[in-house]
């Protein structure tokens, strides 16, 4: 991907398009942790891509491209959230038509199960879980993206895992009562 980024920095529009196609689904998943409306997410991704394209020549470290784009997206999500979504949101069901076109059935089931588990978590916990488990970023890398202390990232991960365990245990207890 670094080679494509360097080409895009030199003005190659096709290289930029290839990069976007590689990271678009990841950006969607990250935006979905904060914004529930698919149209808003599409607009945010488009705005992020426009801003990325305008400023790609300023990027000094091509290996940090994805982190840079995620930072831009998160900032845009936070601005929209403050402006439009004042109350706490939960994650909606996916717009399945769009999603099914882009992903295999197994991926869809895995992602829906994952989102179902995290939908009631606080935003900070959701975004850290997504970045850590789905994007496989290290705690250190996440702290740089979100501009928070590494220990805060660890705390969010711990609390998120504990809440998920608690919710799973409660669901098991309900199932036992029904049986």
PLM region spans:
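Short, charged helix-capping/linker segments at alpha-helix termini
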Residues: 9-18, 28-47, 145, 150, ...
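Helix-turn-helix DNA-binding module
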Residues: 116-127, 135-152, 163-166
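Residues within the DNA-recognition helix of helix-turn-helix
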Residues: 23, 156-159, 163
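C-terminal edge and immediately downstream basic/flexible tail or linker adjoining helix-turn-helix-like DNA-binding
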Residues: 3, 7, 144-147, 161-179
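Short helix-capping/turn signature of helix-turn-helix
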Residues: 22-25, 33-34, 130-137
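Internal acidic/polar
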Residues: 79, 87-112, 116, 138
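Sigma70-family region 2
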Residues: 9, 49-64, 84-85
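Arg/Lys-rich amphipathic alpha helix in sigma70-family domain 2
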Residues: 57-60, 71-91, 159
């Amino acid at each position: 991907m670094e080679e494509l980024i360097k080409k895009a920095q030199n003005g190659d529009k096709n290289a930029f398009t290839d990069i976007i196609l590689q990271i678009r689904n990841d950006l969607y998943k990250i935006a979905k942790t904060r914004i529930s409306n698919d149209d808003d997410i599409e607009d945010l991704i488009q705005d992020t891509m426009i801003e990325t394209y305008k400023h790609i020549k300023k990027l000094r470290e091509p290996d940090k491209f994805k982190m840079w784009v995620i930072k831009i997206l998160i900032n845009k999500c936070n601005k929209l959230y403050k402006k439009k979504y004042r109350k706490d949101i939960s994650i909606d069901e996916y717009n399945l038509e769009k999603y099914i076109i882009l992903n295999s059935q197994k991926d869809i089931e895995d992602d829906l199960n994952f989102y179902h588990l995290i939908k009631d978590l606080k935003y900070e916990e959701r975004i850290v879980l997504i970045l850590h488990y789905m994007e496989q970023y290290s705690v250190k890398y996440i702290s740089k993206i979100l501009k928070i202390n590494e220990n805060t990232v660890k705390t969010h991960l711990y609390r998120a895992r504990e809440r998920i365990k608690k919710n799973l245990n409660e669901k098991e207890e309900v199932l036992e009562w029904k049986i």
